[in-house]
Amino acid sequence: MVDIFVCGRAQVWHNTAKLTPAQIKAKIGCTHIINGYLFNSKFQPVGWTVIDGTIISRDAYRDWGVSIGSDGRPQMLTDRGGSFLSGVPLLKSGARLERNLTPDVARRAARTAVGWMPDGRVCLWCDKTALTREQLQEKLLGLGVSDALMLDGGGSTQGIFPKGKVSSSRKVPTLLLFWEKKEEPAKEPAMEWAADNGVLTAVQLAEPERAVTRRELAEVLYRCRKQT
């Protein structure tokens, strides 16, 4: 499951209540949700987890991760000042990155990843197809992704997109939430004038493409005549 979209804002979620992605999505109202990074047997996240400046977990490394600043936009940075979630760096500016992986992370497994297109759009990968890191890098490069991070995978891989979902019975302590930014419809001067001057009713304005009857046309023309 893959989706590429304009992201308006994102959030790191610390799942202390052990909610499912569906429960979190219903509670918060995000458009996309995926599992986060690795965790230990005590349900504690490993690597860096920072939420609004509060450090939940940390390690000795200062590598790239999902960094969310005051504007709410996720980026692949090392800045941990706002919100931050670690990941395994896969790509930067279209170049493959390599990090030493433990055997359980390096093996073929279901994968979750977050990437960025050259134009800034976010690419989310959440799929049960078993891939190595190198195969995932190849898939993301094929989609045109320039920057990318690999998150937890295997049985942790889970997510919900507007057009699909990947399920898992495993609860995970961190998740990433995204809100797709919808393009605002272009303003139509004629419709704005009709609204401002009472030429069209609220019902007619709500359905601008609907054909009008002769009676409705006569009423519109009559209202225009009264204004002159």
List PLM regions with ranges:
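Gly/Ser/Thr/Pro-rich low-complexity, intrinsically disordered segments
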Residues: 1-182
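Short, solvent-exposed alpha-helical surface patches in non-cytosolic proteins
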Residues: 185-199, 203-228
